[in-house]
Swiss-Prot record:
Keyword Electron transport on entry: no
Region described as Disordered: 1-29
Record's signal peptide: none
Name of the gene this protein is made from: FRS6
Similarity comment text for this entry: Belongs to the FHY3/FAR1 family.
Protein name, per record: Protein FAR1-RELATED SEQUENCE 6
Induction or repression: Up-regulated in hypocotyls by far-red light treatment.
UniProt keywords, alphabetically: Metal-binding, Nucleus, Zinc, Zinc-finger
Organism: Arabidopsis thaliana
Gene Ontology molecular-function annotations: zinc ion binding
Record keyword Hydrolase present: no
One of the GO biological process terms: regulation of DNA-templated transcription
Subcellular location: Nucleus
Amino acid sequence: MERSESVDEDVQASAYLENDEVRERDDPMSDTLRIGEEALVCSSEHEIDVGFCQNEERKSEEETMGGFDEQSGLLVDERKEFDAPAVGMEFESYDDAYNYYNCYASEVGFRVRVKNSWFKRRSKEKYGAVLCCSSQGFKRINDVNRVRKETRTGCPAMIRMRQVDSKRWRVVEVTLDHNHLLGCKLYKSVKRKRKCVSSPVSDAKTIKLYRACVVDNGSNVNPNSTLNKKFQNSTGSPDLLNLKRGDSAAIYNYFCRMQLTNPNFFYLMDVNDEGQLRNVFWADAFSKVSCSYFGDVIFIDSSYISGKFEIPLVTFTGVNHHGKTTLLSCGFLAGETMESYHWLLKVWLSVMKRSPQTIVTDRCKPLEAAISQVFPRSHQRFSLTHIMRKIPEKLGGLHNYDAVRKAFTKAVYETLKVVEFEAAWGFMVHNFGVIENEWLRSLYEERAKWAPVYLKDTFFAGIAAAHPGETLKPFFERYVHKQTPLKEFLDKYELALQKKHREETLSDIESQTLNTAELKTKCSFETQLSRIYTRDMFKKFQIEVEEMYSCFSTTQVHVDGPFVIFLVKERVRGESSRREIRDFEVLYNRSVGEVRCICSCFNFYGYLCRHALCVLNFNGVEEIPLRYILPRWRKDYKRLHFADNGLTGFVDGTDRVQWFDQLYKNSLQVVEEGAVSLDHYKVAMQVLQESLDKVHSVEEKQD
């Protein structure tokens, strides 16, 4: 455990700059991820040596602070020596960071106070701190012996720092704005108290400042670059991320804050030679674990870019064991280019270390090309939801729009065989005179990637939305609108994740308490899966069991060796709510327990359809074959998955990321199992406390 100590001490700015020169040299790239022959740059750094004089006599106010603006009552900074604090700055030590902020405060005209410090519990080593303006907060007025003049105004100015793996101190959060007067008026009130501290060791001290050049206080421009002016107006370039002023700093600030609270949070920034941001990728710990569970079928949503949203967002989502959407990772891209998508997919592959079995996307040629290069063995399919949504836009101008839309829907959803689809499509384009329509022509050429009748051998886990009325909703549907700015999205991003995590946890708990009172039939199939599946997935399967009663006349029509073809008739609701009878062919192989329906419900949704259940029942089978009980829908799936992929694998003894992954997965199992009941909770808490005590004992021995 770690503790936080709050320190309330006024600190006088005690040093002044001596030199105007700032020597800058390039450091090696700080964080690079090697993927094949590519080096993907997280950030590049520059080391800046700043002369720090401690025994020089203080110069006059006019010389040091600049001119005085009589209208505003503030000093105008005409000879600014120190750059303003920025997220990404790094220092060799806490003292260097502390002295830097004091020098900056002296230059601007305010005093500094240490608001908080964080220390490790055993070693007492400081690992985090917040330095703020001395006017931050408000003093308590109760139980005071002498009333003093109030100097605090609740000023928000501050910097938050933390120690990183390199033992440097990094600025992770910055607020520059003050809510009170700065400069001359404040300077005069404190100048008599100010003393220059002389160092017996040296007359000058060097503060080494490491700044991540990818972050800036404005738009997508590197403030440290000598090419700043040259690229000042280049943010509209298709090769650069289109950011507004302060967006890049907001991104990096958010990432650093997330890493401060969660070391397994991963992000990567793609920058050009001038340090300008092009593409971004990130994934939190929960998303990475979810990908290890549910990364076999993913949906890459690029509609925010193609739809010209304010934020160039791309999301990777999957389907969890409750049949709900779960976030796997996110990215910001400079544009819809093959190069940007290729970079994003390469990073995803390197971080997640798996190739999806099925990838569903919008119709996007650059993305399609990138997928074929990075995931050559994956099945790439187009989102039927996105295609259906574009019908009004693409066909709305036709004089016979309603008739064409109706014929299009019938061809997509009501055909079971390829020959039926081809006939329905041919009727539509010839009968309504749309054979020359460019959009319909392009759809037909790519029909094998989106029409359900062609996708029956592809597993979708529910992402396909192959039935009328089903839609594939964006993960951030209620949180992101066309004009949502990036800074607002970062706030909503956390809210959306918290809500999804809470919903998943509640669903896990509810799934453990499913009882027989919720059964609606006496069918053995229903009873069987009620004990195994999560509540949400069982409810979906339960509908198929109930609809078995709308099926009748299960008839054997053909035998081919071990394969037997049955014909199942079903009363379905057709046009004008009339009941129609449709025939469904079901192939059954008793020797291996194989059953396949022509509707391909199992591949589309992950559970057997009513027609297949009727054939099993007709042949006296009382339990669903194990091959059709998918582990991904089980209420204990995470525990089973962890047993197969947990500590049994090799863990690099020098890789802290792997340590964290294994510890996180282990603890996650304890958390999920401990939330089932009060007794489970008490045992889990006891075990966690005992484990923590043992870890602390190791630390004490090392000390």
